[in-house]
Amino acid sequence: MIADRIIEHGTLITRDGRAAVEVRIPWYRALPGSCIAGAALTVDGVAAPEDTLRWTMNNRTFSFEELVDETGEWWFPLDSAVLSGDLPVWDDQAEHEVRVDLKLCIPYIITDHGVLHIEEHDTKTMKVAQQ
């Protein structure tokens, strides 16, 4: 829906072999953590291993397995979440292509096929942010 605004430009960071980027919800309403069905993080064509991906929102960090039952934390349209994974970024002076893929379920929209599932993607080019 709002795919070109998923990745917040200039938020790529790297620390201890992990890369992270801030992401915004590509939907117009808040969703509970249980509706974040999956994500992928790729830098310069290399994907972070799925089992290393972590989702941070509201100062809490979750694996995607933990998000399945998470109804206490919500992702709001005005708030950024952080997607991170084991993915070293070696050259912090170069421009890097960052891609985020998100899978969301929208529980209040029911179709003939069940609950609405959306997949959105965004790619941006940026340098590693200086901390």
UniProtKB/Swiss-Prot annotation:
Domain of life of the native organism: Bacteria
Cofactor(s) the record lists: Mg(2+)
Q: Which E.C. number(s) belong to this protein?
A: 4.1.99.-
Which gene codes for it?
carC1
Q: Which reaction does it catalyse?
A: 3''-dehydroisovitexin = 1,5-anhydro-D-erythro-hex-1-en-3-ulose + apigenin
Activity's sensitivity to pH is recorded as: Optimum pH is 7.5.
Protein family per UniProt: Belongs to the C-glycoside deglycosidase beta subunit family.
Organism of provenance: Arthrobacter globiformis (strain ATCC 8010 / DSM 20124 / JCM 1332 / NBRC 12137 / NCIMB 8907 / NRRL B-2979 / 168)
- Summarize what activates or inhibits it: Activity is strongly reduced in the presence of chelating agents.
What role is this protein assigned?
Answer: Carbon-carbon bond-cleaving enzyme which participates in the metabolism of C-glycosides. Acts on the C6-glycosylated compound 3''-dehydroisovitexin (3''-oxo-isovitexin). Shows weak activity with 3''-dehydroisoorientin (3''-oxo-homoorientin) and 3'-dehydromangiferin (3'-oxo-mangiferin).
Note the subunit structure.
Answer: Heterodimer composed of an alpha subunit (CarB1) and a beta subunit (CarC1).
Q: Which Pfam families match?
A: CGDB (PF19906)
Q: How does activity depend on temperature?
A: Optimum temperature is around 40 degrees Celsius.
Query: Which InterPro entries does this UniProt record tie to the protein?
Result: CGDB
Question: Which keywords accompany this UniProt record?
Answer: Carbohydrate metabolism, Lyase, Magnesium
Gene Ontology terms, MF aspect: lyase activity
Tell me the protein's name: C-glycoside deglycosidase beta subunit
